[in-house]
Amino acid sequence: MKPNLKQWKQFMLFGICAWGLLFLVIFVYFTDSNSVEPVPSAFSYVESKKHFPLQGKQRAIMGAHQDQLFSYAIDDQDLLKEGILDSFIVGPGSMKKMAGADNYFESEQEFIMSKKTQKSTSNNHEDDDDEIYLHKNIDSVSGKKAPAYGKRYYHDTQRQHKKIRRNMQRKKQHMIEDSYDWNGFSSSMSKSFLQKLWKGNVSSKMLTPRLQKARREYLRANKLGVNFNGKQNSRKLNPQELLCVLKDRAQVKTLDGKDAPFSSLGWEKYFPKIALNKLYPHGFSTCAVVSSAGAILNSSLGAEIDSHDAVLRFNSAPTRNYEKDVGNKTTLRIINSQILTNPNHHFTDSSLYKDVTLIAWDPSPYYADLHMWYHKPDYNLFPPYEKHRKRNPDQPFYILHPKFTWELWKIIQENSNEKIQPNPPSSGFIGILIMMSMCRTVHVYEYIPSYRQTDLCHYHEQYYDAACTLGAYHPLLYEKMLIQRINQGTEDNLLRKGKVILPGFSSIHCPIKDHIT
């Protein structure tokens, strides 16, 4: 009987040890599997909104458009409370100094944007309970039980509790996000992507599948017959070299009626007698280029914009009811050919197009065949232009020569590592280069988005699409990387205001013989 009793005791002891081991394995398993799934990148999204077609006559009007996934908005004070914005204030210099951004952006995958909102009382209590629970368990395990389990178990437990803490923080973030009133704002752009865009270091592979597909389709379609025979620069030009290339080649050219078919049609009398590059003989000291992007809402940039000597706006972007954010002054307005031909824009009677210098443009074939373009423009801007000139002969109103827009396209392509869309640059990029030819300093607002980045295409329209910021028809992504390379503004200006500061051509000093190509 005694041997049996002894065996029975051994069996019971073995069973207790086995149960203890099983309990420990189950505990470790469930602790590991409790991690919150990381939020998928916004660039692997499944589209849930109905988008306008990316091709044909639904060509984007403005050069700053966007893709719908989440609805986020943000406020200065939220970031100030978290101490995030302060880490970006490093004064003038290169974007390479954005060490603070690197640290911040490593924490999460998504660019979480928020409006000022208070957490609910229940959420506060839950947070407190989580913290109390965590501290109690850390104390009990690491403080009292660690010696009993040995150093290895102690370190394993520490790692487990770090993981628990991260999971709690993610849980809190999701609770806070759920409590916000997103108010229709959206951004499908990840934080890491935005950071790279600020540094001018992104590629088409980082775009959403939809925008990648749109880019491939435009490359394949090549509607305008682009046959680029140039070559990409063998090395990346430094900012000064790139500025000299722009100064040398981005010479603003408008139609003057002296080229066929306009010369034979008697159009010379309709075009202004004074060339655009001589319209303001003394130029301007400082100028503002105001993007129509939704990110400019809630910026309070209006007074700063109006303080400039000249202000350029785009298409049908209004100022009325938006003065606080976009200002009220307008000196020049660039208009896409759709503005002249679409009755919804009221080109003939809207005050937006009066008492300002107008600059219109329309995509032409790549080789700038004026005959072909005149008889088959993308949108037939010529009849409304003629009508407007007859009614308002004293208003400066120009049509850009296609050679100018395609020369800008060539510069972008030569300084990009990938094939860009075979379509003209956006109105935004065209406007920036025109103002660089007129002003000593150019301040560009929300062309490269600030932390207020949103998928709201235009501040005055309720339409959301990531193509508005990153490009579908226009090679916007590559335009913005080029502009960022020559940006002389501070990191803080770009982060808070979406402001890029560029030197005008008159203030750029280049070698007389410059072989930079």
Swiss-Prot record:
Catalytic activity: a beta-D-galactoside + CMP-N-acetyl-beta-neuraminate = an N-acetyl-alpha-neuraminyl-(2->6)-beta-D-galactosyl derivative + CMP + H(+)
Lumenal side of membrane: 32-517
Disulfide bridges in this chain: 244-510, 287-439, 457-468
Main location: Golgi
Source organism superkingdom: Eukaryota
Enzyme class at the top of the EC tree: transferase
GO cellular component, one term: Golgi cisterna membrane
Residues bearing carbohydrate: 201, 298, 328
UniProt topology in membrane: Single-pass type II membrane protein
GO molecular function: beta-galactoside alpha-2,6-sialyltransferase activity
Ranges annotated as spanning the membrane: 11-31
UniProt KW keywords: Disulfide bond, Glycoprotein, Glycosyltransferase, Golgi apparatus, Membrane, Signal-anchor, Transferase, Transmembrane, Transmembrane helix
Cytoplasmic compartment spans: 1-10
Presence of the UniProt keyword Transferase in the record: yes
Subcellular location(s) of the protein: Golgi apparatus, Golgi stack membrane
Its EC number(s): 2.4.3.1
GO biological process: protein glycosylation
PANTHER family for this protein: BETA-GALACTOSIDE ALPHA-2,6-SIALYLTRANSFERASE (PTHR46059), BETA-GALACTOSIDE ALPHA-2,6-SIALYLTRANSFERASE 2 (PTHR46059:SF3)
Biological role stated in the UniProt entry: Transfers sialic acid from the donor of substrate CMP-sialic acid to galactose containing acceptor substrates.
Family: Belongs to the glycosyltransferase 29 family.
Protein name: Beta-galactoside alpha-2,6-sialyltransferase 2
